[in-house]
Amino acid sequence: NEEIYAYEDFEDESLLSKDLGINIFLEQTIYKQVKDNNLESDLKKLIIKIDKCLTSTNGALNFKSLGFKKYEGVGNNKIYGFDFNNKVNDSDRIIACFVDDYAKKNEFDFERYNNSQNKDKQGIILFSITKHNDQEREAQKVSKRINNSFYEHNQFKYVNEKKSKNIEIISVVNKNTQENNMTFRSLDFDDKQIIYQEVLTKEQSEQIHTFIQKSEPFILSGIAGSGKTISTVKLIPDMVEKIKNMGSDSKILYVTFSNNLKQYVKEKVIESYYEFNEYIDIKTFEDICTELNYKYNNKKIDRSRIITQNTYKKNFTKFLNYLHQTSRDGNILKFIKKYQKEKNIIYSEIFGILKGSMYVDWDREEKDIVKSEYYINDSNKIVEDYKIFAEEDREILYSITQKYNQWLVENEYYDINDIAFELQSLIKDKNINYEYVVVDEVQDFTEVQIYMLFLLAKEQEIYGKNKTRKILLAGDPNQIINPTFFKVGRLRKLFYLHGYNYEDKRLNENFRNSINIMKMNNIVNKIINDKLPARKEEDRQYEITKNNKTGIVEQVKASDENLKVIFTQINASAKVALIVSDDEKKEYLKEKYGCENAFTISEFKGKEFDNIIVYNILSDYADIYEEVYKKESLKEGHYSYYFNRFYVSITRANYNLVLIEEKETEILKEIKEKLGDNLRYIENIDTFKDLNLGELIGDSSELFNIGMKFFYDEEYAQAKNYFTRSVEPNSNNLAKICDLFEQEGKYDEKGDELFHIGEYKLAQTYYEKAYNFEKYAIMYLYMNNLSYEKQLREFYKCLDKQGINFSDLFDNYGYRFDKLHNILKNKIKKTNKLSSNIGLKIKNVNQLLGDINKKMNGR
């Protein structure tokens, strides 16, 4: 959400953006142009010139010197143009407007980015860079996009002092590619770097401001694409300022279940909030569980043996196969057979209820499994909404869970719920806490896991009277596809039981999905509300789109000919993904059609593509939906799980969505009826292009970036598929090692493989899993995205945190890692000189430097 780019030296380099009389904002189009063409230094020069024109008393220094021209805009907008002499083209133009003239200025919190005491700064929005001869058309496009409408029958005038002429309207050839949503980045700079920060909407800004001001538990619910992660990351400077003002040495914990999301947040903090980095720990839930066990119990849990909601499919299938082979209990075998095609229902009950729930009053004391009498009998200790099985089935499930616990011990596996439950006592006994705890994608967590994180937030008095914990939990109940049984109401109950005041806010603005997909989202939500009336009010939602793209929603007839065209030709595209219901369907398509671009819903959660094809997500569970439509009254139970799977699938699409369903289910009929003309039906296609999805191929860098996302989430087969089609540096090397990485464990070896091919950030994540913190620290010295000063600072901080002696480190790794030699040989003086700047917290820094000198002399 904030990015930093170094730029070359140029005139007026001593000026800081905070000293200027203007605030600059970049719309996403020009941001991409500047970034792709390395135009940071040219842009800064223009900004300084604009500032001088606005603030100078010199009559010769005015906007005319910048080729300033005014266009007659649309509605309340006034559109301007500036000359933009740059290294790519010295006759380009920038299309812009003043914030005060921007028709939708009240929708964005532009004021938040005024980093000066001068609150009267003018704000300027830069929209795009265009060729001189195309400026009128580009200004017209910008005006249309600002007003979110099309003007085929109007005329657009270009005006300056010398001439006035009418420009014929350019018809919109393809609305799907011409329309675009608008998001903005503020621009700040000093003499070393440029920082881009995403501008929050007023809605997002108001919600996070509430959390900072009230310092109370905060529930931030938000629909898919509403900017929940953006909002939580933006809190970091405010939280750090609060900690500093208190004179506290406490820290912030930012936790998620996704490795990919963890890496995204971590990079943003290092790049944009580096000065706050020492105040925040960014972890996956698995990270924090293993770290606490290692630090306080001196226990290294093999992370390849931990079963989580992200990894349960493979390991739980092993258990069910074992049970099928060894059990002589006919009731158990019959029950397993009954749910053979829906193993997730069995696992959900075990993981989310029998092992993952905390009872109605959040007071569970039994480890490994809830009390049998509470679960089997009709006890009020279990949340009513969680009771979806009959009593005889609950007896069988309880017995299966007991056998599962035994299987875990015998095979040296760990259930993440069991680890979290045991850590609750450790956290209380050792008084382990953070000043702030931020939980992203909270719907992915069970109650046991949430309660552990709740305990990590320090309980404290606020305003000298009420006790509280500063914990923010952000998520979306409609995206529960992991077996957690998450309910927002359960969080409210937790806070109520502790006597805490709390805030509960919601984000309903959708920035991801195009207009027609958003319409479909609302139709699906309305159907869920109608069919599951017991659904809690917090799960009911109506989405408001902030994406101006119309997009398309299509249904393609599921004929053999159409399926063959789609599944054999989809591999060539980096901009289209196919989502299927489970691994069996994915393997079937791969075997029959050679289809490599198919993903399960779980694999694709947290990711997005411009174009999504959804195949048989409704048809594969037709019997479930038929049951929903036949019954008059239903508990939400596991039914919401199937609706959520469909909702998550369709919301992965940024612009265009294609439905392929072999069965005409009642829910599909209702969706089609309510979409009406917004759904296009395609009877036959001859080529993949007949889907009319626009640009399909993408480029090599897109393929590589998608591959990296899957690699971070340890989806190696999917990562390999994209690496093999990319020609970016290291694509081939990464593709080669994907097969090796499918093996369990061996994290240290995997880290070495990644180090060998120069993937240092990736290598660091595997060294962390291997508990090899020496190599973990060394990786900082290889990260080119960090300045040398920052490399040293992170390196030494890690040594200090882990109690690693530099002398021992050099003896063990000096000959292998050349960067250690650099410290000793070439950079010892600079290290000494920078020691105060990098804020070394190592005891006896002078002794450390003395040891380095001795070793250098000895070499």
Model-predicted segments: where are they?
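Non-Sec secretion/translocation targeting segments of pathogen effectors
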Residues: K854-R859
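Basic, Lys/Arg-enriched alpha-helical interface segments
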Residues: N1-R93, V99-T177, M520
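Conserved helicase motor core of SF1/SF2 NTP-dependent helicases
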Residues: E198-T201, S221-D238, M246-S250, F257-Q263, ...
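N-terminal pre-P-loop "Q-motif" helix
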Residues: Y196-E216, I419
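Residue-level signature for tetratricopeptide repeat
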Residues: K709, C738-L740, E753, T765-Y766, ...
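Coupling/switch/interface segments within P-loop NTPase motor domains and analogous charged loops
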Residues: K105-E107, E278, I301-Y414
